[in-house]
Every structure is written in C-alpha cells, then in structure tokens.
C-alpha cells in the first residue's frame, strides 16, 4: 500500500468497535523548542509545570493570553535534547507568533517542524501490532519513548492508542506492513472527544480559560503552585474565587447536520429551545451517531436534552467523561 497523506476519509468509529487503524494526523502540527533557555521560557508561558515534566511523560497544557484565555492547548513532551508540542494546525501559526513575542530576550528557538510526520495507531491489538516495529513501546508509566527517528506517545483514554512523531521512511513502512485500516484526522478527533481532551481550533482561540475546557481535570494540565506565567492571575482567580461557570461536555445522539467549531447549540426547556454553549468539535460516526464536544454552563443537569440549532426531530444527550471534575480546594 503506497504511503500518501492524508489517508482517505472513512467515517470514524468509537474506541470499542475500532479495528486496528493507522491514522494520518494532518489536522495537527508539531512545534519544536530548542536552546538553553527553553525550559525556563516555556515555564513562564504555559499552565503546566514544565520543570517537573519528566522525559518519559507528556502533558496537555494551555498557552494563555493576559486575560487567561487560551490561544491554544499544547501536548508538550521532550524530544531529544529539546521540547516539542503538538496542537491543532488551524491555530498553530497564530499561537506560535504569540509564543515567540518575548523569545528575542531568551536563548530559545521556536519553529514549526514541517518535516516530522504525525501518525496515530489505535484500535484492536494496536500494542501487539506496533511491537513488531519498535523494541520498546510506551505505556501509562512511561508515556514517551524514543527510537531512532521516532518519538512514541502513549494514551490510555478512551482506550490504549499511540501517537507517533516520525519520518517518511517509517511512515511508509508502517503503511505497508502494519496491516491496519487507514483513516484521516477525523478518527483521532473522535477518540479525543471520547477521551474528553479539549480541541481548540481557530474559531475558539482566546475564547476560554483552561477550566472551561476541563483542563484542570487532566493530570498536570494546570499547575496552581508554579511561578508566574502569562494569564496566571485570571486562571487562579477562576479556581480560588469560583469565577469559572463553564465546563466541557461530550454530547451524543442524532443530527441532520454537523456543527462547526464556534457554533452554538439549543437546549430543551419544556416545549421551548434556548440557544446555549459553544461547539469545540463534532464528528459523525459510521453508525450515523453524532458526537459533539461543547463548552456550556457547568451546572447542566445530566438528563438535559440538546440539538443542533433548528434541527427538528433530532436530539443529543450528555455522555459521561472518563475523569472526575471534582477539584481540590
């Protein structure tokens, strides 16, 4: 099978029904950060504690503006002697420009890596299938492993899967020999929605503080004990003064159309429908089920009913996320 990305589009499947699948992640991009001041610089820019990030771990963190609103969220990890992060391609250029604003005063180089290829491997027996290509695979305890030109990231949610930062030669070999079905970024997006990992595309950049997208519920995503970083005051206020009234939800059901990032939905109140929320991402699955990731008021009743705007005869309901939103005070 010839290697050519993006792989042809198939309707995504849920993690419970997904066969072994190799996924081209063309909707995501990679940025590298190198130089002696890299750790210190990133520590002053993102919500995670970069100084505590082990070489065998990755973390979903946020890069905020001065008001605590996220330019984007970043999947940060060590790559060789440097740091790297993955984010949605639609926000990458603007986010990187913002991150570079004060870099002139530090010994750090920030650049998009156009040569690296991003692939996902997920579905049934994905660990077993990958083990014939790499001598060591990451797991929950050692979530980042490097082998030659490839860095492998492990994810436990919604079920075991792997993200590979690699080169063309390895991608060609995997495409040819993995004996997996192929799919494009929509499949990985569906798995991220199921996992409760917030998706920030361009339409929602600088719209939400991290807690509105549940980032504080993901291990290491927001550190409230580290030193100053851009937007810290607003992020801390949301926690300690209860200023955040929003949360991120996963909705599932039927819809005749797929909403776009930035769209609102409708919430059923008696026999009326009221506009609510902001869509982060949405996908239609192979069984016609529609999944939507949306930010709404964080006091929504679990039995609430929603729909895409003006989508009569269809409805969506709240699904349980695989993590707790209860915070330590």
Curated annotation (Swiss-Prot):
It holds the Pfam family YgfZ_barrel. The keyword tRNA processing applies. Its main location: cytoplasm. Gene3D superfamilies: 2.40.30.160, 3.30.70.1630, Aminomethyltransferase beta-barrel domains. Keywords: Cytoplasm, Folate-binding, tRNA processing. SUPFAM superfamilies: Aminomethyltransferase beta-barrel domain (SSF101790), Folate-binding domain (SSF103025). It is found in: Cytoplasm. The keyword Cytoplasm applies. One of its GO terms (molecular function) is folic acid binding. Folate binds at residues 28, 188. GO terms for biological process: iron-sulfur cluster assembly; RNA modification; tRNA processing. GO terms for cellular component: cytoplasm. Signal peptide: none annotated. Folate-binding protein involved in regulating the level of ATP-DnaA and in the modification of some tRNAs. It is probably a key factor in regulatory networks that act via tRNA modification, such as initiation of chromosomal replication. Belongs to the tRNA-modifying YgfZ family. PANTHER family: TRANSFERASE CAF17, MITOCHONDRIAL-RELATED. This is tRNA-modifying protein YgfZ. The lineage of its organism: Bacteria, Pseudomonadati, Pseudomonadota, Gammaproteobacteria, Enterobacterales.
